[in-house]
Amino acid sequence: MGKIKIGINGFGRIGRLVARVALQSEDVELVAVNDPFITTEYMTYMFKYDTVHGQWKHHEVKVKDSKTLIFGTKEVAVFGCRNPEEIPWAAAGAEYVVESTGVFTDKDKAAAHLKGGAKKVVISAPSKDAPMFVVGVNEKEYKSDVNIVSNASCTTNCLAPLAKVINDRFGIVEGLMTTVHAITATQKTVDGPSMKDWRGGRAASFNIIPSSTGAAKAVGKVLPALNGKLTGMAFRVPTVDVSVVDLTVRLEKPASYDQIKAAIKEEAEGKLKGILGYVEEDLVSTDFQGDSRSSIFDAKAGIALSDTFVKLVSWYDNEWGYSTRVIDLIRHMHSTN
C-alpha cells in the first residue's frame, strides 16, 4: 500500500504541527500546503523555528521557488488560494485535506476542497454539522462514504477518552468540566477589541480569563450516552502550551478513588494505549510538552469527596497531541476506505 497523501489548508499553529507529524510518519506523505497570507520563504522560517516545540532538526527545509518547498529531498507544492474551490489538490496528488484555517468549519464550506480534487476533508476544529470523531472513542463509527469529518477540539480529545472509561466502568450521572487552557492565537497580547467576548479581549499574558467552551457538550456528540450529562467552561491562563482538564462527576456505581485509578490505568495500558496516559509522579504542565497522547490522567491530582462524587484531572499538549490525532484519524479513514 502506498503512502497516504495529504494537503494542508492554513499553515498556522495546527497546520504547521500537523506537517511536522506527517513528515515524521513513515506512512504519510505531505504533498501540498495552501496559505494565501504567507510566502514560501516565511513559511519555511515559521516551520523551522517554533517557540514552543523547538527547531526542526529532522532534515533540511528550503525554498525551491515561489510554489515549491523542499523537505529533505521531498518537494511539496505551495499554493496561495483564498478560495478553497480553487486549490488544485488533485494536481498535487493530495487525497486527504486537513482544513486548519479555522474559517471553513462547516460541511458546506469545507466541501469546497472536494471541488479541487480532494477525496476527504478533516476539519481540525469542532464543526456544527460535520460528524465529529475522537480517536480512541468513536472513530470506528466512521463510514467510508463520509467525505467531510471533524477531529473535534483538543479539549474534547482530552475529555472524551477519560469520560468514556469512567462511564463504561462506573456510569456518569452528570458532570462539570473546567479546562485550564494555555493561550491560543485568537487572544490579545495587550487589551484590545473583542466584541463577542469582552473578557477575551484582555491581555493574554497578564490575566486568568474565564471563557466559554463547547468541549464538554461535544462529548455528547461522540458519546451519545453522555448527551446532556456534561457541560463546562474554560480559564485561559498565561502559559503558551499544555492545558489540563478538571472533570468532576457524580457516579452511578459507587467506587473508591483507588478503584477509579486502577480502571483508568488498565485502559491506558490496554485498549487506549497511546491515547490515554496515566501518571503518578509529581508533574507540572511543561512536563507534558511534546506528549503525543490525547489525555494523561494525573492520579495524584484528583480527589474524591465520596464514593459517588469525584474530581479527575487529566493533562494534554493542546497543540502536539491534537495534531498527532489529526494524522491518526486520517490513517483510520484510509484503512476504512
Curated annotation (Swiss-Prot):
Reaction catalysed by this enzyme: D-glyceraldehyde 3-phosphate + phosphate + NAD(+) = (2R)-3-phospho-glyceroyl phosphate + NADH + H(+)
GO cellular component: cytosol
Record key words, sorted: Cytoplasm, Glycolysis, NAD, Oxidoreductase
Principal location class: cytoplasm
EC number: 1.2.1.12
CDD domains recorded: GAPDH_I_C, GAPDH_I_N
InterPro entries: GlycerAld/Erythrose_P_DH, GlycerAld_3-P_DH_AS, GlycerAld_3-P_DH_cat, GlycerAld_3-P_DH_NAD(P)-bd, Glyceraldehyde-3-P_DH_1, NAD(P)-bd_dom_sf
Site (Activates thiol group during catalysis): H181
Top-level class of the enzyme under EC nomenclature: oxidoreductase
Top-level division of the source organism's lineage: Eukaryota
GO terms assigned for molecular function: glyceraldehyde-3-phosphate dehydrogenase (NAD+) (phosphorylating) activity; NAD binding; NADP binding
GO terms under biological process: glucose metabolic process; glycolytic process
Residues reported to bind D-glyceraldehyde 3-phosphate: S153, C154, T155, T184, T213, G214, R236
Function: Key enzyme in glycolysis that catalyzes the first step of the pathway by converting D-glyceraldehyde 3-phosphate (G3P) into 3-phospho-D-glyceroyl phosphate. Essential for the maintenance of cellular ATP levels and carbohydrate metabolism.
Family per record: Belongs to the glyceraldehyde-3-phosphate dehydrogenase family.
Name of the protein described by the UniProt record: Glyceraldehyde-3-phosphate dehydrogenase 3, cytosolic
Naturally occurring in which organism (per UniProt): Oryza sativa subsp. japonica (Rice)
